[in-house]
Amino acid sequence: MAAVERLTIATRASRLALWQAEHVRDLLRARYPACSVELLTLTTRGDQILDRTLSKVGGKGLFVKELETALLDGRADLAVHSLKDVPVDLHAPFELSCVLERADPRDAFVSNDYGSLADLPPGAAVGTSSLRRESQIRARYPHLVVKPLRGNLDTRLGKLDNGDYAAIVLAAAGLERLGLAARIRALLEPDDSLPAAGQGALGIEILQGRADVRAMLAPLGDAATLACVTAERAVSRMLGGSCQVPLAAYARIDGDELALRALVAAPDGRRIVRAERRGPRDQAQAIGESAARDLLADGADAILAELLPTSPAP
């Protein structure tokens, strides 16, 4: 296979997205010094629509379409995504070619005045961008007011600093990647806020026909992370996972096994269905599918029927 002399990485324009793309660029440059690796910065529809929640404007695919167009028309050879933003069903001619080692998958509590969610007084406003976080906060802290929070990381922090919210909840990985870990007042353990499928991981998307790019990316992948996110995304895929569904799935490697936890919640937090499964890590897909079936059998189907036009069958 002929050596690739030049690679172009498609990326969103936010500071966090650029950090992620630059991280992949630097890894590729270090491994393939003879290859020129550059960035193509694009603005996605998801970056432009900031006055409505993702659940109301089309969901996660809003962050990838423009990048996929660049792959199709040859302007880019690969696209770097936060994996939790990548739809679980990637259709031909696209493929998720590589998943890098995961950063911290937890959610982070950020506030200028309070140390944790438990410290917030009744009626305090908590900002979050996802129904998943909202439902879990409402379930544990029904006295708090959860308000939507859109925009890039700097915009969200600015809204907190302007007094729009008493606290906000964000992905810890994004704060840490941008050197903002000092803003974190508390990390929310999975018992308090189960993460989204793929949270903290970076995924690289290519065209299925680019065997040359796939071969170059292979050494960058992390097998343990891939197993975990495969199980998580299997749950989401079987349940029609999207921004319209308060769905969480988090897997970790425990010795030779993969341990998976998942939940589906009503947006108001009054109903939460949970499932746990574990098994050999090479059975990640099956573990995720089993957990999804458990959720459906235990009542998630009723929640999904209220949220989705066509809900999955058990």
Curated annotation (Swiss-Prot):
Catalysed reaction per UniProt? 4 porphobilinogen + H2O = hydroxymethylbilane + 4 NH4(+)
Pathway given for this chain reads:
Porphyrin-containing compound metabolism; protoporphyrin-IX biosynthesis; coproporphyrinogen-III from 5-aminolevulinate: step 2/4
One of its Pfam families is: Porphobil_deamC
Q: State a single Gene Ontology molecular function.
A: hydroxymethylbilane synthase activity
Cofactor(s) in the UniProt record: dipyrromethane
Q: Which SUPFAM superfamilies match?
A: Periplasmic binding protein-like II, Porphobilinogen deaminase (hydroxymethylbilane synthase), C-terminal domain
| Family annotation (InterPro entries) | HemC, Porphobilin_deaminase_cofac_BS, Porphobilin_deaminase_N, Porphobilinogen_deaminase_C, Porphobilinogen_deaminase_C_sf
* Keyword vocabulary terms for this entry: Porphyrin biosynthesis, Transferase
In its UniProt record, which GO terms are filed under biological process?
protoporphyrinogen IX biosynthetic process
Q: Name one GO cellular component term.
A: cytoplasm
The record's listing under CDD domains reads: PBP2_EcHMBS_like
Give the Enzyme Commission number.
2.5.1.61
Cofactor note as given: Binds 1 dipyrromethane group covalently.
Give the domain of life.
Answer: Bacteria
- The chain residues annotated with the modification S-(dipyrrolylmethanemethyl)cysteine are C243
Family assignment?
Belongs to the HMBS family.
Chain's role:
Tetrapolymerization of the monopyrrole PBG into the hydroxymethylbilane pre-uroporphyrinogen in several discrete steps.
> NCBIfam families this protein is in?
hemC (TIGR00212)
- Misc remark for this entry? The porphobilinogen subunits are added to the dipyrromethane group.
Its quaternary organisation is:
Monomer.
Q: What is this protein called?
A: Porphobilinogen deaminase
